[in-house]
Amino acid sequence: MEPVSHQDMPRLSWIDTLYSNFNYGTDGYDAEGNEEHKNSREGSETMPYIDESPTMSPQLSARSQDSVDGVSPTPTEVLLPGGESESDKGLLMRKLVLSGVLASEEIYINQLEALLLPMKPLKATASTSQPVLTLQQINDIFYKIEDIYQMHKDFYDKLCPIVQQWDNKTTVGHLFQKLATQLGVYKAFVDNYKFALETAEKCSQCNVQFFKISEDLKVKGPKDSKEQPQSVTMEALLYKPIDRVTRSTLVLHDLLKHTPTDHPDYPLLQDALRISQNFLSSINEDIDPRRTAVTTPKGEPRQLVKDGFLVELSENSRKLRHLFLFTDLLLCAKLKKTTVGKHQQYDCKWYIPLADLVFPSLEESEPIHQLHATPDYEIEEMKAKISVLKSEIQKEKKSNKGSSRAIERLKKKMFEYESWLLLYSPTIPFRIHNKNGKSYLFLLSSDYERSEWREAIQKLQKKDLQALALSPFELQVLTASCFKLRTVHNVPIISHKDDDESPGLYGFLHVIVKSAKGFSHSSNFYCTLEVDSFGYFVSKAKTRVFRDTSEPEWNEEFEIELEGSQCLRILCYETCYDKSKLNKDNNEIVDKIMGKGQIQLDPQGVQSKNWHDDVIEMNGIKVEFSMKFSSRDMSLKRTPSKKQTGVFGVKISVVTKRERSKVPYIVRQCIEEVEKRGIEEVGIYRISGVATDIQALKAAFDANSKDILMMLSDMDINAIAGTLKLYFRELPEPLLTDRLYLAFMEGIALSDPAAKENCMMHLLRSLPDPNLITFLFLLHHLKKVAENEPINKMSLHNLATVFGPTLLRPSEVEIKGHMNLASDIWSHDVMAQVQVLLYYLQHPPISFSELKRSTLYYSTDV
C-alpha cells in the first residue's frame, strides 16, 4: 500500500458536499422501500460552477459565460431541425431548458406539499390534552418550509403560462431575478437544518404516532402522470431544499448560454446569476466545516484512503456495494437506481468506526452454510455469451451499415451479462466484525485484493483512533462526499472501456515459477498466480509447497488461459499447519501471505515466441519467473507429430492399429489412474497440473517407456488429468473430426427433441470406429467422475466445459475461410461445443454395438 499523501487527498467543506450532488431535472425515488429514500440526493459527476480544488473551503467560481459548458437535457442535433439560424436554435434551446425547469419545479413543489401536509393536523393537536408534538417542536421541524413552498409556487404559477404560450420574444428574466432575491430564506433553513433533523429524530423515538407519520409521507406525481403517490420519509424530504438551492444557478448558466446578448432577458439573467453566486459564496464563508462529518472527532480532515466495488453477502443474497475506507471509519454504500439521464447517487447501508472494527479469527468465524457457489458451468457459459456479444459488436462496428442503435443494444446486453458475472463469480470470504457484535461478509475473487483491504485497514488502526458516532446529518454529508471523493467510478467490467483502450490479451500465457529469495526464516512456501479476466482477478495456478527452506526452488511451468487479461499477479504464502486455523469454508485461504506483486502484460512485450525472464519484488522477497505468450489463433492449430512412433500428435487410427487396441493405451492408463485415486479430487480436470510433470509424462508415453506405470503411480493426479487433456488437444484433428464439425453444430441447434436425437446419434455412427469407441470410453469415465460431484465439485456441465472445446473444434480450413479472426470463431462456437458434449453426457448409456446395428435412427447422409 502506498503511503497516504495529504497533498493528493481531496478535501471538502460541508457545503461543497451538499452542493456537489444535484441535478436540475426531475427527482426520482428508489422503489425498494422507505429505507432507500433516506439520505437521498441527486448526484452529478460534473460540477462546472463550483470550485473543486482540494481545499477545506472551496468557493463558487464566478466564471464568464464563454467558459461555461451548459447542461442540455437532450442533444441539440437530435432536437433541432436543419436550416434554422444559430439564434433560432439557441432560442429553441431556451424553451427546452425552461420546460425542464417547469417539470423540476412541479416535482419539488409536490415534495414540499407532502412535507407540509402533516403540519396542520399536528398543529391542531398541539393545543389538545394529547398532543403528538408541541408547538415549539413543530416550528423547529418545519422551519421556513412554508416560505420556501410559497416562493416556488409563485415562481411556477407565473412561469407555466409563459412556457405554454411560448414566443421567442417572451421574457422570463424578471422571474429568475425575483427568485434569486428571495434566496435568503434558504439561509435560515440551512442554519436550522441540523437542529430540525435532530428534533424530528427525537420526536420519532418518543412518539410512535409521529414515527409512523414521518416514515410514510406520500408524494404525488406530476399532474398529467398516472403514477401512484410514492412513499418517502420526512428525513429525505427535509433534505430537498438543501439539495435544491443551487439548481437555479445551473439553470441560469444554461439560459445565459442560449440567450442572445441583445435579448431583453440577458442582463436580468446575469443579475440573477450574480445574486445567486454571492448567496452561495456567503454560505461557504459562514458555515464552520468542523461541525460536519468531513472532519474526524479530533478536528482533523477525514480523508478517503481506498475505495472499490465488492460483493456483500447480506441476508443470504449477493449485493454489489461500494466500500469506502476513510482515515477513521469504513463506510458501505450502494449505488441507487436512477432514471435515464440522471446521475448516480449513493445510499449508505452501514458504517463501522475503525476503532470498533475487528477481523475475526477462524475459530470465531461461523462457516458459510448459506453460501451456494454458482456452478462453474454457469460461469463459463456466461463468459462465452459475453465473448459472442463482443464479436457481434466488433462486426457491427466494421460493417458499413452498422447501426448505432444495434451496437447500443448489444452493449446493454453485454453490460447485463458482465454485471451478473461480477456478482456471482466471487467466492473468497472477507469478514469484518464490529465490537458491538454485528458482522459483515464480503465475497472476493482475489486473495490479493482481500489482502490489500486488510492491510490498509490495519495500517490505519495503528494510529490513535477515537470512538465516534455520526448523526444522521453527518452521515448524509459523508455519503454525499463519497460521490465526489471516489477514485473508482465504474464497476470493473470491460463494457465500460473505451474503444481505444487496450483490449487485453487472448490466448495462453506460459509461466515458469523458478525460485524465491529474501525470506527471513526457513519454512514451507508456495506461490499462486492470478490474472484479470472479464474485469476481475481470478486465481489460475498454484505451485507445490517447497518445505523447510528459506530459498524455495519450484521450477514449475503453468499454462494459463487469458481472456482479455492485462495483468499478472504473484502471491507468495507460508503454509499454516495450526489445526485451530484450518479453514471452515472451501474457499477460505488461511495461509499467511508473505508477499505479493504484479506486472502489466504488455501486448508488445509478450508477443515474442521466446521466453522472457522477470523478477517481482515484494516485501523484501524476490520471486524469479519466466513467461511467454501464444495467441489463441495459434492454439487452434494442431501440429502433427514428426515422429510417427509417438502417440501425441499422431492420428488415433494409427495409434490403435499400431497398439492393436480399440482405445489408445494413454487414454486407458490415464483414465484408470484417475478413477483409482482422483475420482474424489476437488476440481479434477479443471485444476491445471504442473506443466513440467505433464511434459515428463508426454515424453514417457511418446517413448513407450517401461517406467510409465511407475511414473503414473507417483505423479500428482492433476498432472495425469492434464496429460489426458493434452493428448486430445494435440490430436491432428479433434476426436469428433473436422468433417463432422459443422454437422454437430447444426444438430445441437435443432429444436425438436426427436429430430435432435436422430441427428446426434447418426453423427456418432458416422465417426470412424477408433474415434467412436474412444469417445464412448471417455463418456463412460466422465459420467463416473460426475457421480462424485458432491465431493469433487465436477458436474456434467463442468466436465463438458473442460472437454467440449478440446474434442470438437473448427478445422484450419474453416478458420482461414472465415471472414473474422480466429478468436471470433472461438467465441461463437465454444457454447455449442460444450452443448454437444453435454448432450451425450446427459444421454442414457450408449453402446457401440447397439448404435451400429440400430434401425431406430433414420437420417440422410451428412
Curated annotation (Swiss-Prot):
Q: Mind telling me which SUPFAM superfamilies this protein's record contains? A: C2 domain (Calcium/lipid-binding domain, CaLB), DBL homology domain (DH-domain), GTPase activation domain, GAP, PH domain-like
Residue numbers spanned by region Disordered: 29-84
Write the record's keywords in alphabetical order, separated by commas: Cell projection, GTPase activation, Guanine-nucleotide releasing factor, Synapse
Written domain comment of the UniProt record: The central Dbl homology (DH) domain functions as a guanine nucleotide exchange factor (GEF) that modulates the GTPases CDC42, RHOA and RAC1. Promotes the conversion of CDC42, RHOA and RAC1 from the GDP-bound to the GTP-bound form. The C-terminus is a Rho-GAP domain which stimulates GTP hydrolysis by RAC1, RAC2 and CDC42. The protein has a unique structure having two opposing regulatory activities toward small GTP-binding proteins.
Matches recorded under InterPro entries: Abr/Bcr, ABR_PH, C2_dom, C2_domain_sf, DBL_dom_sf, DH_dom, GDS_CDC24_CS, PH-like_dom_sf
What CDD domains would the database entry show?
Answer: C2_ABR, PH_ABR, RhoGAP_Bcr, RhoGEF
Gene3D superfamilies per UniProt: C2 domain, Dbl homology (DH) domain, Pleckstrin-homology domain (PH domain)/Phosphotyrosine-binding domain (PTB), Rho GTPase activation protein
Sum up the protein's function in the record's words: Protein with a unique structure having two opposing regulatory activities toward small GTP-binding proteins. The C-terminus is a GTPase-activating protein domain which stimulates GTP hydrolysis by RAC1, RAC2 and CDC42. Accelerates the intrinsic rate of GTP hydrolysis of RAC1 or CDC42, leading to down-regulation of the active GTP-bound form. The central Dbl homology (DH) domain functions as guanine nucleotide exchange factor (GEF) that modulates the GTPases CDC42, RHOA and RAC1. Promotes the conversion of CDC42, RHOA and RAC1 from the GDP-bound to the GTP-bound form.
Question: Which parts of the sequence belong to the PH domain?
Answer: 303-462
**Which BP terms in the Gene Ontology apply to this protein?**
intracellular signal transduction
Mind listing the GO molecular function terms for this protein? GTPase activator activity; guanyl-nucleotide exchange factor activity
Give TM segment ranges: none
Residue stretches of biased makeup (Polar residues): 54-67
What is this protein's record name? Active breakpoint cluster region-related protein
Q: Which residues form the C2 domain?
A: 488-616
Q: Name one GO cellular component term.
A: dendritic spine
Domain (DH) ranges: 93-286
Q: Known Pfam families for this protein?
A: C2 (PF00168), PH_19 (PF19057), RhoGAP (PF00620), RhoGEF (PF00621)
Could you tell me which residue ranges the Rho-GAP domain spans? Answer: 650-848
This protein's record includes keyword Isomerase = no
Q: Where is the composition biased (Basic and acidic residues)?
A: 34-44
State where the protein is found. Cell projection, Dendritic spine; Cell projection, Axon; Synapse
Q: Where is this site: Arginine finger?
A: 686
